[in-house]
Amino acid sequence: IPLCLVGSEMCIRDSPLRMNHLQMKGTHNSYHVEPIFSPTREYMYTHQELGVQASDLGVRQFELDVWWDVREGLRVYHNQYDSGTTCPTFQSCLEALLLWSQENSQHHPIMIWVEPKDWLEQGAEITTTVELTGILQEIEDEITQFWPANLTITPDDVRGNALNLTGAVLDEGWPLMDECRGKAMFVLLATGDMRDLYMDERPGLVGAKMFPMFTSQGQYPGEEVIFSLTDPITDGEE
């Protein structure tokens, strides 16, 4: 809303909106379908399909659990006891959101939180561990393949000509809202070894498709711009 001085032709406008000025409605396990036989009350809920969440419910932040299957590639579900999903593959989840996005090209930017999952897989005769670097690269590859580059907000976009990502955000700010409409930002929802592998393979996040998530400052100075603070009492001041 413009602020104008009474009796003057001068009108001072508020600073233009940037990405970080938004508050978004989000869903956790955004793909989830209640199992027929639920082992716990925590699984007893069903989300609308992703496109319906965006169009009818105003959701702009989505969270996807991504598993790697040796036969079927990247799958999306909660766990082996809670596997109901509205979009069984990472590709189908991206396609559902992209369809809505392209039909509503002026929408506020959406955030897609991607949580890679790994576990010991029991084979017929051997036990193998899914290689973390492999699933991370496959996720990157499918984002590249199934979400247009010109509709993706990447670390390179935010960094611009600055020396690092944190410096760019502190000095220049997040991208303007008008530059982000119709686009998506992908966030790597991982800590520990998974996040470290992702960042070690992509020094300075150059060429990365996802923004890593942090829970505190000082872990990767220069690249920390997305934080998850989930305790309003403990984290209130931050």
Predicted stretch roles:
Residues 41-44, 87-91, 233:
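Conserved phosphate-coordination/catalytic loops
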Residues 44-54, 232-238:
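Short, acidic/polar
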Residues 185-238:
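C-terminal active-site rim and adjoining tail of enzyme catalytic domains
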Residues 48-51, 56-61, 66-189:
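Metal-dependent phosphodiesterase/phospholipase catalytic core, i.e.
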Residues 30-35, 71, 194-197:
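Short, solvent-exposed loop/turn elements at domain surfaces
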Residues 13-43:
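Boundary/entry segment of secreted carbohydrate-active catalytic domains
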Residues 1-12:
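Single conserved hydrophobic/aromatic residue that forms the stacking wall/gate
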Residues 6, 17, 57:
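Structured loop/turn residues at beta-strand edges in well-structured enzyme cores
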